[in-house]
């Protein structure tokens, strides 16, 4: 009996320590300091500090606030993000020359696309964590938000290039459907093209 009880206690302690390590490890790798310990992540971090998201209402968001789902109910998404998405980035950090911002910029469109697709997959969960009960200002914004809801769009479909250096925007619904990056067509250009095709 005492052998079984001892095994049970040891198993319980090991289990609790394991859970603590998983939660503690996740918390550690979600810190901005951890993210920017890779040389290439310094560039986006400096851009964040110059963006409208930095300092607004006293908030200084970290990398995780946009790029890692937070909270207990999203813990599995945070783990997935660090393991499945983060490990390839870590490997790329060692196999790609990011020694200058110009070299980093060569890879920026690919990184932006992947980040946008993650936000799309999460229904802009990380945006909504801070921007709750958004009230669109003005008639055009209200119309755009109504259209967003009816067409299955989410925050990131329209709100791209808000924080980091601008790169070409993507049509995320088309990208999902085609399984590859699809550039967003400017509305005016699209309308002009349609007019030209009627002639």
What annotation goes with each model-predicted range?
Residues 1-199:
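Short sequence/structural segments immediately N-terminal
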């Amino acid at each position: 009996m005492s052998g079984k009880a001892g095994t049970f206690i040891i198993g319980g302690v090991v289990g609790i320590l394991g859970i603590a390590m998983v939660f503690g490890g996740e918390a550690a790798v979600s810190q901005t300091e951890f993210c920017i310990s890779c040389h290439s992540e310094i560039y986006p971090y400096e851009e964040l500090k110059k963006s409208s998201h930095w300092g607004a209402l006293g908030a200084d968001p970290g990398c995780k606030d946009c790029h890692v789902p937070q909270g207990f109910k999203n813990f599995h998404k945070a783990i997935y993000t660090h393991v499945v998405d983060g490990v390839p980035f870590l490997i790329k950090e060692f196999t790609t020359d990011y020694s200058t911002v110009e070299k980093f910029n060569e890879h920026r469109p690919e990184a932006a696309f992947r980040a946008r697709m993650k936000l799309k997959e999460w229904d802009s969960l990380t945006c909504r964590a801070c921007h709750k009960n958004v009230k669109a200002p003005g008639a055009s914004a209200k119309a755009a938000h109504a259209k967003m809801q009816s067409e299955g769009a989410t925050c990131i479909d329209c709100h791209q290039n808000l924080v980091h250096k601008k790169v070409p925007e993507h049509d995320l619904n088309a990208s999902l459907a085609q399984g590859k990056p699809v550039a967003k067509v400017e509305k005016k250009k699209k309308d002009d093209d349609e007019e030209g095709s009627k002639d």
